[in-house]
Amino acid sequence: SMEFGSRGTTESIADMNPDDIESISVMTGAAAAALYGSDAANGAMLITTKKGKAGATQIQVSSNTEFMNPLRLPDFQTRYGTGRKGKASGSTIHSWGAPLNQAARYNYSPEDFLQTGHILTNSVTLSGGTEKNQIYFSTAAVNSKGLVPNNKYNRYNFTFRNTSNLLNDRLTLDVSGSYIIQKDRNMINQGVYSNPLVSAYLFPRGDDFSLVKAFERWNPARKIYEQFWPQGEGGDLRMQNPYWIAYRNPRENSRKRYMFTGGITYKITDWMNVAGRIRVDNTNSLYTEKLYATSNPTLLENSKKGKYTETRGEERQTYGDVMLNLSKTFKEKFSLDAHIGASIKDNRFDELSVYGPIAGAPNIFNVVNLDKSQKKTPKTGWHEQTQSFFYSLELGWKSQLFVTTTGRNDWASQLANSPQKSFFYPSVGVSWLPSSTFNFPEKFNYLKIRASWASVANPFPRELTIATHPYDDTISGWDDKSNYPIGQLYPERTKTWELGFDARFLHGFTLSASWYRADTYNQT
C-alpha cells in the first residue's frame, strides 16, 4: 500500500554483471510475441552475454568508484516556524507557525539528513581457448552505500561459459552458469511509514535538527533505548525520527540466485540447422524487518516490545525450446528465413512468512520470541505452465521487398476450466526498402517503409476459473468459504494495425515514425 510501501528490493535484471554484457537489442511487434510468447506482447529486450574467444588467454581487471550527491532537492520555505495557521506550537510536524526572525532560523535543509553515497565496482574476467573450444569466466563485486543513512547494497557475481565446436563444426555446444549473491539494507520504497525521507522533508523549520540526530534515549526503568522524536507523528502520516527509521526499523533482503543455460545446435546443411535450449533460473530469498520497541504504535500493532517479520521465498523458472531454422537464397533474387519450433515455460513460486509482536524480552528478533496468540504465518504460492508451438516466416525479393508472417499457439495453465483451452495469435507484415530499389544520395542512404497487422493474446490471471479456499490467520486454518470460480472467461486479445518508416541519414542520424491502432478485447 502507499502507506506501508514495499520491501524496496531490486529488479532481477539488476542482478547482471555489466561486464558480462556483449550487446543489447530490442525486438518489437509480432516477431517478439511469436518467438517469446505473450510476455513479449509489448516487445522484448535481448541481452547477449560475452563468450570466450579463440587465442591467447586474456585477463582483464577493472575497478570503478562513483560518488553520489543529490543533484537538486525541492525548495522549502524557511520563513515560518513550527506550528499551524500562523500560530506557534512546541510539538508538531507542521511548519506554518509564526514568522521567524533571522536569529531564530536554523536554516535546516533535508540535505542535512543525507550523506554522500558511493558505489565501488571491481571485476575480473578471463577469456581464451582454441578454435574448437572457448571459455569465459568473470567475477564481480558491487559494494554501495546510499544517500540515506544505513542504506547498503552488496552484490557478488560469478559467471562461467564454455562454447565447443564438434563434428567438423557441425555441432555447437554452449553451456553457461551464473551464481549471484545479493544483500541489501533499507532500500528506499515509495511508502510513507517506512520512508525516512518523509519526516526529513517535513521537519519543522523552527526546530533544531541537530537535537534529533541523537535519535534514542536510555530508559533506566525499562532498560531499553527509546525513540526521541518530540515532533510527533503528524496525524495519519505516522512519522518517526528519520534516524530511528534508518537504524531501528531496518529492512534487509538476502538473495541467492543461480542460472544455468544449455544450448545445442546441429548444422544439417549450410542453410538449415536444428537447435535446442534449456534455461533454469532459481532464486532463494530471505527478507527480515525489525521494528524496535517505541516505534510507531500502528506499525507495532500496539506492542510495547517490538515486532519482527521473517519471509522466505523460493522462485523456480524453467524454459526449454527446440527450433528448426532455415536461411536460404534462391537464384540471387529470392530469400527465405524461417523458424519453426515448440517451447515450454514452467514457473513456480512459494513464500512463507512469520510475523507478529514480540512477547518476551524486548528487541530480541527471533520467531520464537513472538506472541503466539498474535503470530501470523501466511503462506502463498503458485504454479504456472505454458506449452507453445510457433513459427516465423520471411520471404524476400532482391533484399528490398519482404513479406513476413508469424504465428504462435499457447496452451496456458491459467485457462483451466475455461471454454478456451488455448489461443493462437498470428501476424502479417510487409516492408519495402526504397533505398535499395533506387539510387539514394549518400547523405540519405536508408529508408524502410513498413506495414503490419497482428493479433496478440494474453491469458487471464491465474486461479480465476478454479475454486480456492483462502487461509484465515484468525483461525489458523483454511476458510470454509471458497472463492467462486468464473467460468466464462476468454484470453485477452489485442488487434493492431501499424504503418511506419525507418530512415538513416547524415552519417549517423536515425528517424523512426509509426501510426498504429490497437483494439483490445476480453480484458479482465
Predicted features along the sequence, with ranges:
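A beta-strand signature from Gram-negative outer-membrane beta-barrel systems
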Residues: 18-60, 119-121, 142-145
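A generic beta-sheet turn/junction motif
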Residues: 40, 128-132, 141, 164-168, ...
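Short, glycine-/polar-rich solvent-exposed loops and beta-turns at beta-strand/coil boundaries
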Residues: 18, 36-41, 151-154, 442-445
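Short acidic/polar hinge/loop motifs at secondary-structure boundaries
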Residues: 2-28
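Outer-membrane beta-barrel "beta-signal"
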Residues: 427-431
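Surface-exposed loop/interface segments of Gram-negative outer-membrane beta-barrel transport/assembly proteins
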Residues: 54-106, 147, 151, 157, ...
